Amino acid sequence: MFTLKKTLLLLFFLGTINLSLCEEERNAEEERRDGDDEMDVEVKKRFITGLISGLMKALGK
C-alpha cells in the first residue's frame, strides 16, 4: 500500500511539472505572436504617415 502511494504521488508531481512546462511554452508562443502584431501595427502607422506626408507634398507643389 505504501509503495502504491509513493508511486501515485510521484506520478502526480511529474504530471504537475509537465503541465507547468507546457503552460510556460504556450505563454512564450503567445508573447512571440503578440510581439509580431505590435510590430505590424507600427509598420502600418509608419506607412500611413509616410503616405499622408507624401500626398501633402504632392498637393503642396
Curated annotation (Swiss-Prot):
Residues spanning the signal sequence: 1-22
Record-annotated disulphide pairs: none
GO CC terms: extracellular region
Pfam families linked: FSAP_sig_propep
Protein name: Temporin-SN4
Tissue note: Expressed by the skin glands.
Residue ranges of the propeptide: 23-44
Superkingdom of the organism of origin: Eukaryota
Keyword annotations of the record: Amidation, Amphibian defense peptide, Antibiotic, Antimicrobial, Cleavage on pair of basic residues, Cytolysis, Fungicide, Hemolysis, Secreted, Signal
Chain positions found as Lysine amide: 61
UniProt similarity note: Belongs to the frog skin active peptide (FSAP) family. Temporin subfamily.
Function: Antimicrobial peptide. Active against some Gram-positive and Gram-negative bacterial strains. Active against fungus C.glabrata 090902 but not against C.albicans ATCC 12231. Shows weak hemolytic activity against human erythrocytes.
Swiss-Prot/TrEMBL GO biological process terms: defense response to fungus; defense response to Gram-negative bacterium; defense response to Gram-positive bacterium; hemolysis in another organism
UniProt-annotated location(s): Secreted
